[in-house]
Design a protein with these regions (language model features):
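N-terminal beta1-alpha1 cap of cysteine-dependent amidohydrolase-like domains
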Residues: 1-109, 120, 127, 131-165, ...
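Conserved G/P- and acidic residue-centered "switch" motifs that form tight phosphate/ATP-binding loops
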Residues: 112
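Hydrophobic, aromatic-enriched interface-forming segments
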Residues: 115-118
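Active-site-proximal beta-strand elements of phosphoester/diester hydrolases
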Residues: 211-214
């Protein structure tokens, strides 16, 4: 199938522009390249400041991307002092995207922060900081400069959609996150974990076709697994 339109969420980042440093909606071009590789068009959904509720009419697939931490008020917790780059505008925009995608059964790939937000949308919660939660065997919070490197392995449950897509039971992934899923949301199952027990993959068990992955496939876009995920989303 060709000529599909994939909606991709993004955040706001202070960026050097001609007038100086100003807040801009930014997205890794790797997302666009991967969509175009499978003959799909990419459109961007930045955070909305006053109207987070908008339509997904004309959108065939959704990617909810990585970024800063999610406000813990969305899962009824007080904020940890380890939180970084929280944006309520982005939270509300992306939660609305997930709500609309579920209502319309739009195929969804949720990445890193998006994977965590998918869990929150389904009623789950997060570990606000992985080391504080007692997980110290793997350093999951590698600097952004290591985004293209394979940091650790994950194990994929063979009875899951993720396994059917990737056709492997172990996979080496990158890792640039300090938060992780705690309580699993409703109508979700765990598809992958790292050896320390951190949830690295989730997927829906209801009629909505949605997958969350804790790693960043767009930064290791030459990997077969990354291409298989985008092929699943688009085709």
């Amino acid at each position: 199938m060709t000529n599909l339109t994939i909606g991709i969420s993004t955040g706001i980042k202070d960026t050097q522009m001609s007038p100086g440093i100003i807040p801009c909606a930014v997205l890794s071009a790797e997302f666009i390249k991967l969509c175009n590789k499978f003959e799909a068009h990419a459109v961007i959904f930045p955070p909305q400041y006053n109207k987070p509720n908008f339509s997904l009419d004309g959108i065939d697939g959704l990617i909810v991307t990585g970024g800063g931490d999610i406000d813990p008020s969305h899962y009824n917790e007080h904020p940890s002092d380890k939180l970084e780059r929280v944006s309520m505008d982005r939270d509300l925009t992306e939660l609305n995207l997930l709500k609309k995608a579920e209502e319309k059964n739009i195929k969804t790939l949720a990445i890193c922060r998006g994977h965590q937000l998918l869990n929150i949308h389904m009623g789950g919660s997060l570990h606000q900081d992985i080391p504080d939660a007692g997980f110290k065997d793997i350093d999951h919070a590698k600097p952004y400069e290591n985004a293209t490197k394979h940091i650790h392995e994950i194990e994929i449950d063979k009875n899951t959609k993720l396994n059917q897509i990737l056709k492997v039971e172990t996979l080496k992934v990158n890792s640039i996150h300090h938060q992780a899923i705690n309580k699993l949301g409703d109508n979700l199952e765990v598809s992958a974990r790292s050896s320390d027990g951190i949830i690295e993959g989730i997927e829906t068990t209801n009629n909505w076709d949605a997958i969350g992955v804790q790693w960043h496939p767009e930064y290791i876009s030459e990997d077969k697994a990354s291409n298989d995920l985008f092929d699943w989303l688009i085709n």
